Amino acid sequence: MMRKFLIGFLLACIVLPADLLFAAVGCDLNDPDRDVARLFPGSTGYKTNYVAIDQKGGPALLTQVEERLGDKFQGLFETIDVPYTLYEVFKGKDKIGYIHGVNQKGQYGGIQVFVVLDLDGVIKNFYFQKLTSRYGKELRDQKFGEQFIGLTLKDFYNYDVLTGKTSGPSGVERIKNPVPEAEFDFRAALRGTKKNLILVDEFILGNKYLQYQKTVGEQKK
């Protein structure tokens, strides 16, 4: 009896850390050196920052992020302790931009949505690092990603991640789904992008775009 108890206890000690390990799923560049050089031609270096909502502001910050997103965080990809990886990119001593990615639930599996931003939070590039989808070819097409260029969080505040609709002027309206059957993954990409931009605004830009959330709220009244 005692032997069974000891075996059970040891197994619990082994399994528990594994559960904790997989409870928070981060999103890193597959090859930072190569990817940063490709996304920022002429850059000379980068700094990697790891930030989590529970460390930065805890439950209060999570609530604020969810309000800005217009949806609740859920699943392994959106726990309060997810370690977000933010890349600050430099040319010499000058900072020239940021790269940040998030995990997002797709129809057939996880999606990794990355945005490349200038210092003002304007999207300079968009791409999927991981995309498990029957329509991956169409969604990975360069023309699809180009539709995000020039947009900011201000545009995405007018996009409702729950309904998939925009209200008021928004550059998100110009982003077209290349395949009607890919609607789930298309909307997942937009939700992931909005979440991405909100986290960068919270962690790096000092809530520069928070003022526009209030404007959108007033428009809906």
Each predicted region: which residue ranges?
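Sec-dependent N-terminal signal peptides
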Residues: 6-12
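Positively charged n-region of N-terminal signal peptides that target proteins for export
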Residues: 1-5
